[in-house]
């Protein structure tokens, strides 16, 4: 998993509340068990005017020019600004996969659905919670300022606006440690690789009859 320490990124404003996981990545794209290939279909039903299908050539599909991610000024955005209860709906982990593969490193919103919130941390995506008032002000500034960027510092737990104002956010210490060091569940397990190998060797030596055919 890619570590997250500091990030300067262009902000895209998704001014909708209760964005669910089926809107983030529609159900027809969930057939793959790989963690890649979902970025091109992020917000598929909003980005395109037709109904998307797996393995389709998106370059030939009609774009919804009114959708924020299709606007020229938000191309290359890596910070998504959203409203309350982002990521609600079914518990598909494909949602943070799609957001991360598209290029987003962080989401800023007043609240998230619990399962999406947890899955984001496990996939290198930083979901930041700010107050409604702080989010409202960010929406106003982003929409009024082309090229609006934020500086996110995970170690300091701060979001710095272009005008210099610093917004503080809270994060669980364990999740912060994992993101700073790029540790997902597999990475955490591998940290104990020597201890696991020692246990297996001891177990094999003490009960060799269990491993005669191994």
UniProtKB/Swiss-Prot annotation:
Q: Which InterPro entries match?
A: 3-IsopropMal_deHydase_ssu, Aconitase/3IPM_dehydase_swvl, AconitaseA/IPMdHydase_ssu_swvl, IPMI_Swivel, LeuD
Q: What does it catalyze?
A: (2R,3S)-3-isopropylmalate = (2S)-2-isopropylmalate
Its keywords, alphabetically, are:
Amino-acid biosynthesis, Branched-chain amino acid biosynthesis, Leucine biosynthesis, Lyase
Q: Which SUPFAM superfamilies match?
A: LeuD/IlvD-like
What are the BP-aspect GO terms?
L-leucine biosynthetic process
Query: EC class of this enzyme?
Result: lyase
- E.C. number(s) listed in UniProt: 4.2.1.33
Q: In which pathway does it act?
A: Amino-acid biosynthesis; L-leucine biosynthesis; L-leucine from 3-methyl-2-oxobutanoate: step 2/4
Any idea which GO molecular function terms this record carries?
3-isopropylmalate dehydratase activity
Under the heading Pfam families, the entry gives: Aconitase_C
Q: Which GO terms describe its cellular component?
A: 3-isopropylmalate dehydratase complex
Function of the protein: Catalyzes the isomerization between 2-isopropylmalate and 3-isopropylmalate, via the formation of 2-isopropylmaleate.
Its quaternary organisation is: Heterodimer of LeuC and LeuD.
* Similarity field: Belongs to the LeuD family. LeuD type 1 subfamily.
Q: Which NCBIfam families match?
A: leuD, PRK01641.1
- What is the protein name stated in its UniProt record? 3-isopropylmalate dehydratase small subunit
Q: Give the species this sequence originates from.
A: Pseudomonas fluorescens (strain ATCC BAA-477 / NRRL B-23932 / Pf-5)
Tell me the organism's taxonomic lineage: Bacteria, Pseudomonadati, Pseudomonadota, Gammaproteobacteria, Pseudomonadales
